[in-house]
């Protein structure tokens, strides 16, 4: 009898265990369904493990720390570059105020021909390479090359192991020149590359000329994706600096109504200079005031008042210098981001006036 009771007790225990197993399986299965098929386990506190959420947080924290560290290093490097260039530019303008306008113009003449690629900085090589410097719009006209060379060397000396293109340095120099002369500063993003060539004929065909009528000017700026308003704003760069008498005070280039303002010798030598407005060392709105009074020096400037749309922008800038300065800064950012020609061979030049030894300059 006792033996039978033992067997019955054992059978009941086995049934109970089986039922418990079914219950556990059912609860686990339901938990999986409720959690989109993911089995959530409670890990015993005496096991030296971390839950997946904690692991993810640690990974994200590590990534953020690495990202913050990289960003901090990048900002430090960029700050070094900006400081090195600014020191050279400020010194150059202190020595010669006109240099500020020259650096702004140099940047414009670089970017407007096949994008901001430093092509204008390449020296000619006798018999093998003719670049943009001696193209008619630039010959004996664009200047400031020595300042860019000094700024490049300053970056090399002050910011070791930082590779910055000559095109970037030129963009920074133009921005700092504008600020130095009283214009509105703006952000210059780094990352441009230097071309291994330049475009002699492109400088002739793409750059605006003093003799261009309004239709031609609008087309040239439209080709670079500038609006008419941006074109009129960028023309305001002529509120600072000088131009050669032989360029602006000759028939076809000069505004006939303002020709008497030309303070040039009878021979019109390249050393004779004509200021472009009455405050050539200050970035202001006087240029537009002069246009409204039909006293713009260059023909291409004065024709801006000959069209209802462009004349409206001239009046806007003449009436509100703040609007002009804001529009000019925005247009300079856009110009400074003009990309190099598709398929152009690019590098970061060691010396701005020549391609690296591994490259070969070509027309």
Curated annotation (Swiss-Prot):
Cofactor-binding details, from the entry: Binds 2 calcium ions per subunit.
Residues that hold Ca(2+) 1 according to the record: 110, 113, 115, 117
Glycosylation sites: 36, 95, 126, 139, 161, 199, 213, 225, 263, 307, 320
Catalysis performed (reactions): 2 a phenolic donor + H2O2 = 2 a phenolic radical donor + 2 H2O
Binding-site list for substrate: 208
Any Gene Ontology CC annotation: extracellular region
Cystine connections: 80-159, 111-116, 166-352, 245-264
GO biological process, one term: hydrogen peroxide catabolic process
InterPro entries reported for this sequence: Haem_peroxidase (IPR002016), Haem_peroxidase_sf (IPR010255), Peroxidase_pln (IPR000823), Peroxidases_AS (IPR019794), Peroxidases_heam-ligand_BS (IPR019793), Secretory_peroxidase (IPR033905)
Site residues, Transition state stabilizer: 105
One Pfam family, short name: peroxidase
Main location: secreted
Protein residues bound to heme b: 238
Superkingdom of origin organism: Eukaryota
Localization, UniProt: Secreted
Annotated GO MF terms: heme binding; lactoperoxidase activity; metal ion binding
Class of this enzyme: oxidoreductase
Its EC number(s): 1.11.1.7
Needed cofactors: Ca(2+); heme b
Active site: 109 (proton acceptor)
Signal peptide: 1-25
Keywords attached to this entry: Calcium, Disulfide bond, Glycoprotein, Heme, Hydrogen peroxide, Iron, Metal-binding, Oxidoreductase, Peroxidase, Secreted, Signal
Family: Belongs to the peroxidase family. Classical plant (class III) peroxidase subfamily.
Role noted for this protein: Removal of H(2)O(2), oxidation of toxic reductants, biosynthesis and degradation of lignin, suberization, auxin catabolism, response to environmental stresses such as wounding, pathogen attack and oxidative stress. These functions might be dependent on each isozyme/isoform in each plant tissue.
Protein name: Suberization-associated anionic peroxidase 2
UniProt source species: Solanum lycopersicum
Gene name as annotated: TAP2
């Amino acid at each position: 009898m006792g033996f039978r009771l033992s067997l019955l007790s054992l059978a009941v225990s086995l049934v109970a265990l089986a039922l418990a197993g079914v219950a556990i399986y059912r609860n686990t299965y339901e938990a999986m369904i409720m959690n989109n098929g993911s089995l959530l386990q409670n890990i015993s506190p005496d096991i030296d493990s971390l839950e997946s959420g904690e692991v993810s947080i640690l990974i994200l924290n590590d990534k953020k720390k690495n990202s913050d560290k990289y960003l901090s290093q990048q900002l430090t490097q960029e700050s070094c570059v900006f400081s090195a260039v600014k020191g050279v530019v400020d010194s150059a303008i202190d020595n010669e105020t006109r240099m500020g306008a020259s650096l702004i113009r140099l940047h414009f003449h670089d970017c407007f021909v096949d994008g901001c690629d430093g092509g204008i900085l390449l020296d000619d090589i006798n018999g093998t390479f003719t670049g943009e410097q001696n193209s008619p719009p630039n010959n004996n006209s664009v200047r400031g090359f020595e300042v860019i060379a000094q700024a490049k060397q300053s970056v090399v000396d002050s910011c070791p192991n930082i590779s910055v293109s000559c095109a970037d340095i030129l963009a920074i120099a133009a921005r700092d020149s504008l600020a130095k002369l009283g214009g509105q500063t703006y952000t210059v993003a780094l990352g441009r590359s230097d071309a291994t060539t330049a475009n002699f004929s492109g400088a002739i065909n793409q750059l605006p000329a003093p003799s261009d009528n309004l239709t031609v000017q609008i087309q040239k700026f439209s080709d670079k994706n500038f609006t008419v308003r941006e074109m009129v704003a960028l023309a305001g760069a002529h509120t600072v600096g000088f131009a050669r008498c032989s360029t602006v005070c000759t028939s076809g280039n000069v505004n006939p109504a303002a020709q008497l303002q030309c303070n040039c010798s009878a021979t019109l030598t390249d050393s004779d200079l004509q200021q472009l407005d009455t405050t050539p060392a200050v970035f202001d709105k006087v240029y537009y005031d002069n246009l409204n009074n039909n006293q713009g020096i260059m023909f291409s400037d004065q024709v801006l008042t000959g069209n209802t749309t462009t004349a409206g922008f001239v009046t806007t800038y003449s009436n509100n210098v703040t609007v002009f300065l804001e529009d000019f800064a925005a247009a300079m950012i856009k110009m400074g981001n003009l990309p190099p020609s598709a398929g152009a061979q690019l590098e970061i030049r060691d010396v701005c006036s020549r391609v690296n030894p591994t490259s070969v300059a070509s027309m």
